[in-house]
Amino acid sequence: MSEGSGSENAAAAEAAAEAEAATEAALMAEAVAVAYQSDEEEQPEAEDMPEQAGDNQEEDAAEQQDGGEPEADEDADADDAMSVENAENESDSGGNAEETAAADRRQATKKELTQIIDKWEQQQTQNGYDPVPTLRSLAEIFEREKDVYRRKDPDPLDSRHPYRADPSCQYGLLLKLLFRKDTFMGKLLNDYLRENYFSRQNVSRSSLELNILACRLILEIMPGMETSAVFQTAEGDGTINRIYSWAEDSIEPLQSYATGLLAEAMEVSDIAINFRDLNIRLVPKMIKRLHMLLAISKSATSDVNTSMHNLSADSSTAGMLSWVACASNASAPQSPQHNGSGLGASSSQHGDASNMSILFENSRDAFSVSRYYKRMYIPLHPATADTSQMLIMRFLTSLGEYQEFLAMAFENNVMQLIFGYLENLDRRDTCLAYEVLKYLASLLCHKKFALEFISHGGLELLLKVPRPSLATTGVSIAIYYLAYCEDAMERICSMQRPLISELVRYALWILGRCHDSSKCHATMFFSLSFQFKVILDEFDAQDGLRKLYNVISVLKILDPSHNDSDNDSDFNEDVECASRQMVRHVCVALKRYMEAHFFYKYNSFLCQTNAASPAPSSAHYFNQNPTVAAKLTFDQLNDQIRTLQEHTSIRAHWQPVDQLMKLGGITMLLRIIAFSYDWVNSGRSETVRSALDVLSVCCIIPRVYVVLCERLLMLDKTTTSGFCSVLGAAAGEISSDAEVIKSALAVLCHCVCSPIIRKDSGTSLIKFGTSSRKNKANHKYAEELIERVWESVCSNNGIVVLLSLMQTKGPITDADCIRGMACRALAGLARSDRVRQIVSKLPLFASGQLQTLMRDPILQEKRAEHVIFQKYALELLERVSGKTKPLNNPLDPSLSNMHKANVIAQTRIQYNKQQLYQLIFEHLESNGLSQTAQMLQREVGLPLQTPTTRSFHQSPFDYKSLPSGSSSLSRNRLRSRMQDVNAAIMGNGDLNRSFGEDSSPAGAGGSNAGDGVSIPNFSSLNTTQTPIKIRRTDRSSVSRSIQKQAMEPGGMSVGLAEDGQLHPKRITLNTIVTEYLTNQHSLCNNPVTTCPQFDLYEPHKCPDPKPSRLLSSNYNLTSRHARTQAGFNTSRFDRRYVHTHFSPWRSIRSADYEDLEFTCCDLAGKYIIVGTQQGDGRVFNMNDGVEQFFSNCHNFSVDAIKANRAGDLVITSSFWRTPTSILWSIADDEFKLKLRLPDVTYCEFSQTVQDRLLGTQNECATLFDINTGSKVASFTPTIPNLYTKNRATLCRTDELILSDGVLWDVRSGKEIHKFDKFNQCISGVFHPNCLEIIANTEVWDLRTFHLLQTVPVLDQRNCTFSPMHVIYGASLGADRDHDMETTTYDTSFNVLDAYDYSSIATIDVKRNINDLSVSANGSLIAVVEDYSGYESKQETYVKIYAVGVKKSERSEEEDDEEVPESDEDGSDTGSENTFAIGQNLLGFPLLRNLHGSDNDDEDLDEDDDDGEPLDSDDDSDDDDGSDNGDDDGDFDVLEYFDRSSSDD
């Protein structure tokens, strides 16, 4: 005991010593346990990472709960905090008593806060009111609750409101309650921070205590305040200047509190810039204070530790204060660069010794309490030396990133200061070290400081920071900023390998056992450092990939089973957002990891390839310098992946990909892409792009394709394919970012374009085997794998995605690149026979649209990308057509030209040898070589008298019309048509010969050159000259082409042959003549493969197909009807003639038509059933248009109505309200409910017996039994097409179902085939012949599932079949609204031949069409027309048209007149000769004069606007251009319909 202590305090001191000894004994055991537990945490990690996910939190919680007991003066507060924590931790165990106590305590605290604020509101308006007790009480409440909150070990870098970070904490709730008191907050931030507050109240009292409490309370509630809003309002009234003065020179703890407020204010960049001058003056002073506080703390701590067992607490305090006195007269440690900072000149009103005495007095009390257990934070009250240092560090941290303060850091030796704080850290108290590390991280963003830090051994000091501890979070920030500086990382990578190994081990430890913010920093550290090979190798050596993968494998947002636990209160929007950020960082790190491995692997491959090359390459450089960073552009990466794919075995293994697959990383990445559809955050594009880039690199190993084809479990328990997610990203469904689209296309290209036959050379990346048997097995496996990839891509609508991307025009800067990549993917996909067959029928190829795209780039600056698009477009055309692509004119490679070139190339050219000899003979005679000519005549047996040579103009026909003024057709003219056939001809040989210019026309013995074609003179070919040099190509067969190629882009050079070089075959007369005849053959409009012998004297021309007499334009209806008796089938022309004419017959309207809107209709015998917008079903008699009866069927619009053939059952459907479909029976003139189908949006009857109903619910089809109402079968596709307007339908025999583009077998319930999707709306219908399916514009063959043809006129049109073998196509209702901008004929319907889908007519009704129905025998059609306008009231009614009836003159005159008012019964009764309609049209009159006579008005009368064909009456849309000819004879329409019905 010290002798200076008074006798009155002896007993108290002795009691205090005994209590402290007892406390030390109790806490020493806990300290040992903590140390032992910390030692265990440093052991190697377990293999199962998910079990380690929350180790740090559990350990910290255990230390918090068992850390020790507080001093006697804080027993109440600490006990309350511990009781709340225990109650919250044990709530799951069902401790009702603890829960009740905690709830009572929270309620009491809330009540206490409310009472204090209410009391303040009542008294604060009184004169002389003292707010100090109120502020003190509030500060104590918030300090107590903040202590409880901090003991839960929240993330120190989490800047969210405490209530959002932990909704169960009382601290956050109290903050919300306080901030609702705007009056109090205004007083606190404005008035209570004034030095003259009491003097303004006419009270003679110092405001120092009030200012201290105000600063203290503001700092305690700062986590719930918006810093920018608070200090920007305080900037104008001088509050910040006052705080600067307090921070610079004031008494403690006001000086420290003011520094803390400045630290928060400097986080706002605008404030930091505005107060730049004050900061420049204050920063050196703060650094000096830190030097002094550090020196005093270390010295005092050393003395206390050495004399702890010999000296009392008072003597320790005396020793500490003596150090303060000495330090106050001493200067701070000087920097080698600068001696003194000039701060000593300013005098202080409050001496440093007195200030620090207060701080260290409080530090002694805090140290005696907390030296045996882990300290979670540094309290603000009472203010200690650690509190002051913490707040100064925060102030310096907020300014550390500014360049102007970097010089001050060097001048004041900040690095030595930081090193002093980080040396010999105590595991139980690293709170101050955490603040120091944050300050260090702010300085490490400067390259100069980072390099200095590394050179002075800073990295070694960082790695000595104990873990687990709060300072570990600071280390994660520091190493991230170090990795951000590449020069610093290069120096680190050149250090000793054990140090690098320890760095990687430390970062991996952070990945597994720290807060989320620390994990993010560690992940970003790895993503920046993977480019250095030494880090990459060490990462793999320590199983880093598994630990990195485990960071996201335990996240709830990626776990489909998480949806089962909807009551998980820990999972909220903030947690979900934080998890998405974590996924983003991990995906970026995985991308950098795989790209770095790929870079070094590719350079290793280059080293093997160029091993024999003496010249140094970049590959040698990188392999000899493993610390050099590896960087690749997007295009370089894709090209190198393609190269490695060609040299990698089909069964190859690669350690990074193998490990990622073993961990399930490929599936996880696909799940991330699929789940990101529903994510709405700024980093979604980067997340998806990074995941796709990882998959792109992994595609080097073909086994990855299997994972992409497998099914994934989604959050809604549905399944999808990996390729479905990739295709969705390529289509822009996830993000419209061009980089995401290109990354997705890269994955598709690497998969569908993967080589089947891979190079098995010595430069292969990895060789699986060399035996012939293994090669065959590998080849078979490769084919099966690639075919599986093709099938998966097609099943997920890959064709339509790639086709749409090939025609994209935006974003304009990347459109050319996207088109090129999409074209390459489709070209690779076209290696599949199925895809090739489908693509060949699409308009993009069949109509020449691709050639249009190939002409010009979208952006002229992107011509390089456009050239790539042209390259793959030609490759695609070659594969689709099966023909060789022409080389001379690559911009016009239409399928027809390629087909023609292939026909010409396959033609065998034969000619008469005697004619050739005769030409040679004449040539020799004309050149004076008579003896040679006579010798030739004798040897070949030519006749003695030379026949007269026939000139071309004597030909019975001209095969090529010459332009006016042209005297001859030169050989170049002949060649002009060969541009499309050169490649096909040249493709059969390995020689590409060329020779000189064409010779002049022949002389007297030649043909007449006046009007015909001049034959080249071959005498200029001297066979004794040096042979022409010919370059060999890769072709295997012999070519007949000797056409000149020297001036063509792809031509071969011409030169003299050298000795010992190539030995080409000589050009012969036969090849010259053969090419000449081939050129003639290429001019034919319809070339054929098998040709007769060519005549050298006459130009060749293949015969044109002769038009059939039946199809002649002069073959009219009368003669055609007569030829029918002779056995000719003329029904097609009759059908086209009849369905060219439509005449309105009757309009059906209700009596209250102004209030009713018709939506749909169905013709049933002599009645017509109509659905309305009001949900009614109404029945009208077609004879008189009178409404028979009606019933309310739905609460909303009736979208579809259909009656069975018997007319006693009606099914109605409404899309918007439940029940959506109802089956009604019609009896006694009323609708009677028979069956409700609540979830079925569309329904139709079966075709044969009509005892079943087929309902549609989204992509699912369900079959119901009408009699029992039970469900017979359900058909849900595995991979749905998701048509927006799917309507399931049955075939004519009820054996097949088509729903959502999937064909089903009704009896077995199995999927038969999934048709490719080429539109978003219409799923398709069966053709009545049961052999074809029409899905929008595509016609599919049910026997082979081939695409037969496309019918563009049916685009977005519903098909209705007539018994007369025609198809009516119309855009109905919602379909019209869906594509209003793209639909061509919204007010018309098309009539097509059901046999060949040729267009018969397009009938414009000049009004929108809501529905269309056909009668049982096809003689009538009913159209629901919408007569609504922009300014007129909407009016709809049903107009019935008579098929085959020509419009009268009256109807043409009234075509544009207003719609007349209806009669009293609400219908148009027509003329006196209106006919009654029975089941078989027995009362239908004979329309004898269809040409339009004067009594047309007596035969057929209409009162409304009528339909008008877009085509003329006498010219239909026949493809052959024929005229149906109705000038002679009569045509009985009734007989025609009766005959057709009997044929059916």
UniProtKB/Swiss-Prot annotation:
Localization of this protein: Nucleus
Reported phenotype of the disruption mutant: Homozygous mutants develop more slowly and die at a late pupal stage. Zygotic mutants do not have obvious patterning defects during embryonic or larval development but cells undergo apoptosis when surrounded by wild-type cells in the wing disk epithelium.
Domain LisH: 912-944
InterPro entries hit by this protein: ARM-type_fold, LisH, VPRBP/DCAF1, WD40/YVTN_repeat-like_dom_sf, WD40_repeat_dom_sf
Regions of compositional bias (Polar residues) in chain numbering: 1016-1027
Region (Disordered): 1-110, 946-973, 987-1059, 1447-1475, 1487-1544
Protein task: Probable substrate recognition component of tsome E3 ubiquitin-protein ligase complex. Plays a key role in cell competition via its interaction with l(2)gl.
Domain notes from UniProt: The DWD boxes are required for interaction with DDB1.
Subunit structure of this chain's protein: Component of the CUL4-RBX1-DDB1-DCAF1 E3 ubiquitin-protein ligase complex. Interacts with l(2)gl.
Designated name of the protein: Protein mahjong
The species this protein was found in: Drosophila melanogaster
